From Swiss-Prot:
The keyword Secreted applies. Its main location: secreted. The presence of a 'disulfide through disulfide knot' structurally defines this protein as a knottin. It comes from the Eukaryota. GO terms for cellular component: extracellular region. It is found in: Secreted. Potent toxin that may paralyze and/or kill insect pests such as H.virescens (lepidoptera), S.exigua (beet armyworm) and M.sexta (tobacco hornworm). Expressed by the venom gland. This is U3-plectoxin-Pt1a. The lineage of its organism: Eukaryota, Metazoa, Ecdysozoa, Arthropoda, Chelicerata. Disulfide bonds join C2-C16, C9-C30, C15-C41, C32-C39, C45-C49. Keywords: Disulfide bond, Knottin, Neurotoxin, Secreted, Toxin. GO terms for molecular function: toxin activity.
Length: 49
């Protein structure tokens, strides 16, 4: 299964594909923070993957 919002990830494929955020469809991706914070999925999944 795919991972939810702010869950650690290694690649975009681990995060949900899309979500509706404030009425707009957003592509979800694995974002990496600076200073060794690690990578996490960009938006909350809800139940859709």
């Amino acid at each position: 299964g795919c991972k939810g919002f702010l869950v650690k990830c290694d690649s975009n494929s681990e995060c949900c594909k899309t979500a509706i955020v404030k009425g707009k469809k957003k592509q979800l991706s694995c974002l990496c923070g600076a200073w060794g914070a690690g990578c996490s999925c960009s938006f909350r999944c809800g139940n859709r993957c």
